[in-house]
C-alpha cells in the first residue's frame, strides 16, 4: 500500500476507536457475571471480535445490534465446553485472560491463534494457574500456543510475585482468584494498567490494592452492568504524535480514556515540550478531550516505572523522538520483544529505512534527532501498531514514496485509521 506523504498540516476533530482493553474485558466480565450486561461504544476491531466469538463458543448469548452489545451472563459455572478449538486470532489479551477464566471450569479447552500468537510466551500465565490447580500446557509440549487447559472447581488461592510487569498475567490470575476459595495475593513488579481491578469493582466484586500488592478473596459472584467504553489512548497516540510533528497542525481528540495507568505518553510529551491540553475532563469516568498542537521537541529518557504505562505507545514515541532535538533513550522495555512482533527490532529497522538515526538495544532504543525522513519500502510485520506508526512517519516524507507491506494489520485495533487520517490531512 502506498502511504500518504508530504502532508502540509493536520486540522480537525476525531473520535478515536473505543478502548481495546476495556472492550475485551467488558465481554469477559459480562459473560462471567449473573444477569445482563450492555456495552456501548464496543471496539469492533479484529482482536475484540475474537473475544466475542470465543465466549459465544462457550455458550454465552451475545447480541450485537450495531450500536449496543448485550451479554446474557451465565456466571463462571454457566460456561460450557467449546465444541472446537477456540481461535483467538491475533489477540494475546484474549488467550491469556481466558486462561484465567477457564482455570475454574471443569472441562478441557484448547486455544490457538495466528502465526504471531504461536510465538507468544505463555509460561508466564500457565505457571501460576497450574500452581492454583489448573492443568495448563502447550499442546506441542512447549510454552507456545496452541494451549490446552483443564480447569478445576477446586482452585486454590495463590500468593504470587510477578516476575514480569504484565497486566495480562495479573488479570488472568485475578480471574482465577475470583473462583478460588480463600485469599489470593498478587505483587506486581511495576504497576500496570488496572482495568481488571476497576471492572471487578464495577461488576460488584471486592479487592484491596496497596501499592503494587493486590489482595482478592474468593469465590465471588459478579452482577451484570452497563459499560460505556471510552476512546483508546493507545489509538489516540498516533494522532497525538502526528499533531506534534506535522507543521501547523491542531487536532482535537474527543472522549479519550485517561486512566492514570495508561497515560504515560502524556507525561513523556510534556517532558519533551509538547503541547497537549486536557479539556472537558470527566474524572469519575477517567476520560476527556485532548487538544494537540505542533511543538518544538527536546529529547528525553524513558525507563523504569513509567514503561508499563506506555508500553503499547513506545513505537510511536520512538517516531516522536526522531523529530526531537538531542538523544532519546528508551530502556527497561524488553517486553516489546514479545508483542505481536519484536517491536524493538521492527521499529529500529523500519525507521532506519526511512532515514531515522535509531539503534536497538537489549531493552530499548537510542534515537538521535531531529532527522529528516525519506521514502522507502517498509513492513508492519503484521503488527497493527508498527503499521500505524509507519504511516505517521510517512506524513513527514517530502521526497519519494513510502510503500507499506501488510498494511491490513491496522484493522486489528483501528479499522478506520487511514480514513480518519485522510479527513485531517491538508
Swiss-Prot record:
The keyword Metal-binding does not apply. Disulfide bonds: none annotated. GO terms for molecular function: 3-phosphoshikimate 1-carboxyvinyltransferase activity. Keywords: Amino-acid biosynthesis, Aromatic amino acid biosynthesis, Cytoplasm, Transferase. The keyword Cytoplasm applies. Monomer. NCBIfam families: aroA. This is 3-phosphoshikimate 1-carboxyvinyltransferase. It comes from Enterococcus faecalis (strain ATCC 700802 / V583).
Amino acid at each position: 500500500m502506498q502511504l500518504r506523504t508530504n502532508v502540509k498540516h493536520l486540522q480537525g476533530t476525531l473520535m478515536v476507536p473505543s478502548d481495546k482493553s476495556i472492550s475485551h474485558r467488558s465481554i469477559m466480565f459480562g459473560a462471567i457475571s449473573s444477569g445482563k450486561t450492555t456495552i456501548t461504544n464496543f471496539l469492533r476491531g479484529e482482536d475484540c471480535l475474537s473475544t466475542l466469538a470465543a465466549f459465544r463458543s462457550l455458550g454465552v448469548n451475545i447480541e450485537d445490534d450495531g450500536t449496543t452489545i448485550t451479554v446474557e451472563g451465565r456466571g463462571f459455572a454457566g460456561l460450557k465446553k467449546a465444541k472446537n478449538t477456540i481461535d483467538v486470532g491475533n489477540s494475546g489479551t484474549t488467550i491469556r485472560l481466558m486462561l484465567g477464566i477457564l482455570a475454574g471450569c471443569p472441562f478441557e479447552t484448547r486455544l490457538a491463534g495466528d502465526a504471531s500468537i504461536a510465538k507468544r510466551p505463555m509460561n508466564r500465565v500457565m505457571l501460576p494457574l497450574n500452581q492454583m490447580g489448573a492443568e495448563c500446557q502447550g499442546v506441542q509440549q512447549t510454552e507456545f500456543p496452541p494451549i490446552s487447559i483443564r480447569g478445576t472447581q477446586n482452585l486454590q488461592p495463590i500468593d504470587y510475585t510477578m516476575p514480569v510487569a504484565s497486566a495480562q498475567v495479573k488479570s488472568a490470575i485475578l480471574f482465577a482468584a475470583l473462583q478460588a476459595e480463600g485469599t489470593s495475593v498478587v505483587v506486581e513488579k511495576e504497576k500496570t494498567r488496572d482495568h481488571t481491578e476497576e471492572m471487578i469493582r464495577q461488576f460488584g466484586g471486592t479487592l484491596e490494592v496497596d501499592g503494587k500488592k493486590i489482595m482478592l478473596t474468593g469465590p465471588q459472584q459478579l452482577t451484570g452492568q452497563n459499560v460505556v467504553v471510552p476512546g483508546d489512548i493507545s489509538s489516540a497516540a498516533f494522532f497525538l504524535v502526528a499533531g506534534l510533528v506535522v507543521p501547523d497542525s491542531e487536532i482535537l481528540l474527543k472522549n479519550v480514556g485517561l486512566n492514570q495507568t495508561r497515560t504515560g505518553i502524556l507525561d513523556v510529551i510534556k517532558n519533551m515540550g509538547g503541547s497537549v491540553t486536557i479539556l472537558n475532563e470527566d474524572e469519575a469516568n477517567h476520560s476527556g478531550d485532548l487538544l494537540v498542537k505542533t511543538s518544538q521537541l527536546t529529547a528525553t529518557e524513558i525507563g523504569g516505572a513509567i514503561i508499563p504505562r506506555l508500553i503499547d505507545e513506545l513505537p510511536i514515541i520512538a517516531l516522536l523522538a526522531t523529530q526531537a532535538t538531542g538523544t532519546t533513550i528508551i530502556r527497561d522495555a524488553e517486553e516489546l520483544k514479545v508483542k505481536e512482533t519484536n517491536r524493538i527490532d521492527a521499529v529500529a529497522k523500519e525507521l532506519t529505512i526511512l532515514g531515522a538515526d535509531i539503534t536497538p538495544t537489549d531493552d530499548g532504543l537510542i534515537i538521535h534527532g531531529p532527522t529528516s525522513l525519506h521514502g522507502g519500502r517498509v513492513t508492519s510485520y503484521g503488527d497493527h501498531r508498527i503499521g500505524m506508526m509507519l504511516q505517521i512517519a510517512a506524513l513527514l516524507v517530502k521526497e519519494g514514496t513510502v510503500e507499506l507491506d501488510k498494511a491490513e494489520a491496522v484493522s486489528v485495533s483501528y479499522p478506520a485509521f487511514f480514513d480518519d487520517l485522510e479527513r485531517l490531512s491538508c
